[in-house]
């Protein structure tokens, strides 16, 4: 298991609310919680930037983290990430914030301490560009957006 440096920015984290943990031994994501001042209603169509009370420092340029939605919130309540996926670079050290968007037609209350997203570490391969005049031909070529078939 990889060790991450973390700072607790909200004293409720680790006392009133548990630190991010894996729910099961096979879980890929650490649950992030809404460290709001009070329960907050997210109106239909509204987005809100929610603090997690935590900052991390990955430090390894071969790793990054992504913030992903929790499937139950999206499927059952229409609460998804406002930016779809949050990317945390290895050199970022600020608070982890979660952009939540209510895509439903119903107001949704985000409770203080509620699990709102998950953090997943991913490997990173950095690349540089080799400028060429033409590519070697491939079967697909420049075909995209449904080019490989409709079903």
Swiss-Prot record:
One of its GO terms (biological process) is dUMP biosynthetic process. Its EC number is 3.6.1.23. PANTHER family: DEOXYURIDINE 5'-TRIPHOSPHATE NUCLEOTIDOHYDROLASE. This is Deoxyuridine 5'-triphosphate nucleotidohydrolase. GO terms for molecular function: dUTP diphosphatase activity; magnesium ion binding. Gene3D superfamilies: 2.70.40.10. Its cofactor is Mg(2+). The lineage of its organism: Bacteria, Pseudomonadati, Pseudomonadota, Gammaproteobacteria, Pseudomonadales. Pfam families: dUTPase (PF00692). Pathway: Pyrimidine metabolism; dUMP biosynthesis; dUMP from dCTP (dUTP route): step 2/2. Belongs to the dUTPase family. This enzyme is involved in nucleotide metabolism: it produces dUMP, the immediate precursor of thymidine nucleotides and it decreases the intracellular concentration of dUTP so that uracil cannot be incorporated into DNA. It catalyses: dUTP + H2O = dUMP + diphosphate + H(+). Keywords: Hydrolase, Magnesium, Metal-binding, Nucleotide metabolism.
């Amino acid at each position: 298991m990889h060790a991450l440096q973390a700072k607790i920015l909200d004293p409720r984290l680790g006392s009133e609310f548990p630190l991010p943990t894996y729910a099961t031994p096979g879980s890929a994501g650490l649950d992030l919680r809404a460290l709001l001042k009070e329960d907050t209603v997210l109106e239909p169509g509204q987005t809100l930037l929610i603090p997690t009370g935590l900052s991390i420092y990955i430090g390894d340029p071969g790793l990054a983290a992504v913030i992903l939605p929790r499937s139950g919130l999206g499927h059952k309540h229409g609460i998804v990430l406002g930016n779809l996926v949050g990317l945390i670079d290895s050199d970022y050290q600020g608070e982890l914030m979660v952009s939540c968007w209510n895509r439903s037609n119903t107001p949704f209350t985000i409770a203080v301490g509620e699990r709102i997203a998950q953090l997943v570490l991913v490997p990173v391969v950095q690349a540089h560009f080799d400028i060429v005049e033409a590519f070697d031909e491939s079967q697909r070529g420049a075909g995209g957006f449904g080019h490989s078939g409709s079903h």
